[in-house]
Amino acid sequence: MNAWEVNFDGLVGLTHHYAGLSFGNEASTRHRFQISNPRLAAKQGLLKMKNLADAGFPQAVIPPHERPFIPVLRQLGFSGSDEQVLEKVARQAPHWLSSVSSASPMWVANAATIAPSADTLDGKVHLTIANLNNKFHRSLEAPVTESLLKAIFDDEEKFSVHSALPQVALLGDEGAANHNRLGGHYGEPGMQLFVYGREEGNDTRPSRYPARQTREASEAVARLNQVNPQQVIFAQQNPDVIDQGVFHNDVIAVSNRQVLFCHQQAFARQVQLLANLRARVNGFMAIEVPATQVSVSDAVSTYLFNSQLLSRDDGSMMLVLPQECREHAGVWGYLNELLVADNPISELKVFDLRESMANGGGPACLRLRVVLTEEERRAVNPAVMMNDTLFNALNDWVDRYYRDRLTAADLADPQLLREGREALDVLSQLLNLGSVYPFQREGGGNG
């Protein structure tokens, strides 16, 4: 059956700031306390979406979350009106304010793990929300992510959206950032590659930085998504590269159809894994980047592998890269060698995503890949699909509500909270989502 990959990109939120919240993500730590520009960040993301849509790649948008997220501050014992809660937190425990104001939901590669209908036992598209258990600021995302995805994929005959796994370390799940799908045409059954960093009883794990994904979580997600057991491979990421800042697999590997583009040190037991994939995926091609040409450190600093590998109708592929790749002589030299080598990659497309990159999120972090048949695509909420009208409306919306300068101190400003809620109210109407945010359902949550 004919099917296409639709990229659903996260729209950067109004509180995008640099707080260094993500231990193990070296860009996040390095840019802590810098001044951010939320308006520019949102526009950089929108430009990528629009450019790819104009190039013929189906593209949609996932809206930001409500931030600062007052309900969690109340759970932590802060009381009074919303404004009083903000004031108390800023005075007594400012570190919490940064966590509940993080714009990290923009990295929707961590929103969920997707199983296309060609891979599932019941013939539906399945989406399992990620619990993002390893980081407090990200663990807050799952309930609203679930509401948003249910509003976008609202046809229950075609889509099954599953709640996140229990919030315990044993079941730490980071979503599609640790998941690859390999195969022929998108509408054909594919091989799902789940990548984990640790498992119970196995001492092979990183020592410097945390392994966020467990094998136990990956196995549970595969079950929830009803993936045909014959179409699943579980593989461990190389613990040594996690300790070098590869906190998700999409920082060291990216797949598309029959191609796996990865660093030669990406996986534990990589030789065996690639042999297994060759045996089980027709036409499988591994493009392994040697450490002698691109070190793991350079791969992390440029986000070479946090790229999007997209298929054209003629079978060729385009690699979507952050500007940092072009600015690194060694990485750019390798990429130009790749273009003339015998592989499907025939074009490099570079985007300036500096605002997101400084927090450790490149092109692949910003998108959730969903393979859909034509019938399934028609069942998606049409208001989120990118086109000229939506692009212009979202740009105007960003101009109206987003600040062009934000520091950690600004997060305590009650006006920022009010601006954010008004903006999301307007956006949820623009995208025909209904009342997906807690403040919409609770009348603002003042108490």
UniProtKB/Swiss-Prot annotation:
Broadest EC class assigned to this enzyme: hydrolase
InterPro entries: AstB_sf, SuccinylArg_d-Hdrlase_AstB
Keywords recorded for this protein, A-Z: Arginine metabolism, Hydrolase
Listed EC numbers: 3.5.3.23
Disulfide bond sites: none
Reactions it catalyzes: N(2)-succinyl-L-arginine + 2 H2O + 2 H(+) = N(2)-succinyl-L-ornithine + 2 NH4(+) + CO2
Pathway entry: Amino-acid degradation; L-arginine degradation via AST pathway; L-glutamate and succinate from L-arginine: step 2/5
A Pfam family it matches: AstB
A GO term, aspect molecular function: N-succinylarginine dihydrolase activity
Record-linked Gene3D superfamilies: Succinylarginine dihydrolase
Active site, UniProt feature: E174, H248, C365
Domain of life: Bacteria
UniProt key word NAD: no
GO biological process: arginine catabolic process to glutamate; arginine catabolic process to succinate
Chain positions recorded as substrate binding sites: 19-28, 110, 137-138, 212, 250, 359
Role noted for this protein: Catalyzes the hydrolysis of N(2)-succinylarginine into N(2)-succinylornithine, ammonia and CO(2).
Protein family according to the UniProt entry: Belongs to the succinylarginine dihydrolase family.
UniProt subunit comment: Homodimer.
Designated name of the protein: N-succinylarginine dihydrolase
Gene: astB
